[in-house]
Amino acid sequence: IYPYNSTSIIDAYLGKSVVIIHDLISLRKKNHSLSAKYVSYCMLKASQLKADYIYISKTTKRVIDSIELFKNCKGYYFPNTFFRFEEIAKKNTILDLGYILLVTGVGDNKDLDGALKLYSSINKDERLPLKILGCGNAIERVKKIIDDHRVQSEIEVIPFLDLDDVVSLYCNSTFIWAHSKYEGYGRAVAEAKLSHKKILCTQISAFMEQKDENVYLYTNQNDFHIQYKAVLASKYKDIHGQLIEHEIFKSQLEFLYGKK
């Protein structure tokens, strides 16, 4: 049970569920919303009651251990899975229609303003058009942020789409861009791999876990410009078989249910 719904507190007390921990963002002192307090309480209570738990990345597990949450509890590593995304991607033709796909959101950790500062700092003759995905519920707010950077004509904010159209956006991009201060997992990297696309992303732990020859990391504006040019100049290296997260997920599922 994800600790995000109305039955989570009941399940925590009954002890009949496995708690899935995506990230620990709700435990940050800055989060004072009712939903954050509810999620925090459910996680802390489940930990106190020695519930089994599932973590979705090694980064999340390191944080859990560092704050001594779920101490002496049985934990399972179930990486985020993208079976449906992968199924659709396999049916898509992989094209390059000459745009960057920024997969983001409006949460503080996404640092959308910081991403747009980097984008606007690219020389105009080198700057590909940008499509922003993940802000469907806050398009007007995002447009106001864009206005501050004077690159409105080069940016399209994508509204809510069904998964088929989302996958199509990935498959038709030049590369995927994920800019964030912190993540529990970093699904954009895995989705880029499933779409056979290179990805440019901030050098944070959750993204570094998934580093390979198609992942380009940066820490500051200078790094960003270097890696931006590198990702444009390079060719995608077809090194992926089955997504490693899927292999781990299947083995852990068998372990959880005691199958040989």
Map each language-model feature to its residues.
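Carbohydrate transferase catalytic cores enriched for Leloir-type hexosyltransferases
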Residues: 1-260
